[in-house]
Amino acid sequence: MYEIEKTERVKELIAVTKSDSGISGPELCAAHMELGRILADGLRELDPDDTTVVAMLRGGIFFAEGIYFALRCRFETFDPKRQEFVRPGTKNVIIVDSVINTGKTIEDILDLDMYVACCVINENAVAKCKDRLYTVRVSKNSFVGAGVKKQAAGRGPDTTMRLFNQI
């Protein structure tokens, strides 16, 4: 597992992305994009001509764009609710999502030679990705994303809804 170094700037960005930050919309998207660019430093050894970033829709789009801009590779999107996953033809494939709670969606499409990148992953899902995981941080917290503004009773603000300014 690769976890980015927590510089002061990274800590500021993490504070913006946390569910209890109260921040939504473009400011949150910009934080995801910048964190994606920073995380991409750990993936620099990959040949951009033979690498595809696959953004999990909708929540992974901005984090994936940051990685894409930094690596200058290929880019695709995947909607697990509406599509069957088709592995891109490049040697290197990076599946990108903003939040991984259980890891089930990723586990269903992950091959042994693919990478996973995320802003945050629940500690219980880390083992599903093993040494293929690139993350900003690992969290002990896990809750169901919902259209609420505050965390309570196992539910919290849905990251995708926050990214698109819908709560």
Locate predicted features.
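PRPP-associated nucleotide enzymes
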Residues: 1-167
